[in-house]
């Protein structure tokens, strides 16, 4: 099974300039493809996030969308009464996010930053963070730094929702931890156990399970983790 529609594969086949640098890769994708052609760009917010809010397990607060892309989920969350900051490595994606926020007449702050780099300007700023299909873009050697940065951005007892591709997902060849996509990017597919080990030093785990999530062309198997920052 391949997660990309045949017409989309034709579009990306002619792309050039995608290298090993994630910022360059993402800027190229957002420059060269329409939003309709970008596989992770979905307009409707994910059910797991909607359910968390509609059940009132999460109330409006200061929130950060990690790897916000073109801003769909950040703008939706702002419309639900949250004070939202969207962070992404791609300045091209954030240009689109700002346009969307203006079109929807909501305020979001958008910040260009490497989430494995310097996030001091965002320290102790948020009560809720989420990353949706972001962590599988990071290899194991960078994940500890990333999670430490997320914790640094959050206030004590803040909540954190992370959803990334599971090693049980049949897409992109269907096996192996590292899998190449038609875009030229490489993704890392996780197990529940390794995510438990990743998050436990800094977070209490509320929920950890494998779920099916909506994709643009086919569904995916993903690991959902809902966490609370430990109070040290």
Predicted regions and their residues:
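Class I (Rossmann-like) S-adenosyl-L-methionine-dependent methyltransferase catalytic domain
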Residues: 1-62, 70-122, 138-149, 159-232
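Short, conserved loop/helix-junction motifs that constitute active-site signature segments
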Residues: 152
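A conserved beta-strand element that flanks and buttresses the S-adenosyl-L-methionine
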Residues: 130
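Short catalytic micro-motifs in class I SAM-dependent methyltransferases
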Residues: 133-137
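Conserved S-adenosyl-L-methionine
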Residues: 67
């Amino acid at each position: 099974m391949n997660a990309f529609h045949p017409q989309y594969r034709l579009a990306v086949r002619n792309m050039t300039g995608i290298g090993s640098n994630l910022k360059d890769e993402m800027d190229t994708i957002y420059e060269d493809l329409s939003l309709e052609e970008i596989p992770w760009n979905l307009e409707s917010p994910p059910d797991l996030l909607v359910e968390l809010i509609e059940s009132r397990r999460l109330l409006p607060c200061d929130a950060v969308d990690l790897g916000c892309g073109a801003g769909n989920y950040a703008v939706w969350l702002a419309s639900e009464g949250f004070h939202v900051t969207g962070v992404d490595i791609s300045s091209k994606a954030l240009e689109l996010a700002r346009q969307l926020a203006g079109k929807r007449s909501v305020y979001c702050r958008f910040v260009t930053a490497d989430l494995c780099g310097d996030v001091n300007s965002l320290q102790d700023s948020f009560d809720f963070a989420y990353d949706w299909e972001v962590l599988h873009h990071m290899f194991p050697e960078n994940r500890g730094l990333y999670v430490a940065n997320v914790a640094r951005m959050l206030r004590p007892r803040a909540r954190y929702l992370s959803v990334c591709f599971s090693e049980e997902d049949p897409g992109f060849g269907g096996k192996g931890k590292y899998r190449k996509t038609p875009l030229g990017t490489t993704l890392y597919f996780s197990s529940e156990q390794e995510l438990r080990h990743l998050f436990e030093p800094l977070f209490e785990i509320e929920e950890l399970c494998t779920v099916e999530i909506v994709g643009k062309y086919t569904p995916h198997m993903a690991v959902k983790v809902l966490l609370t920052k430990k109070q040290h």
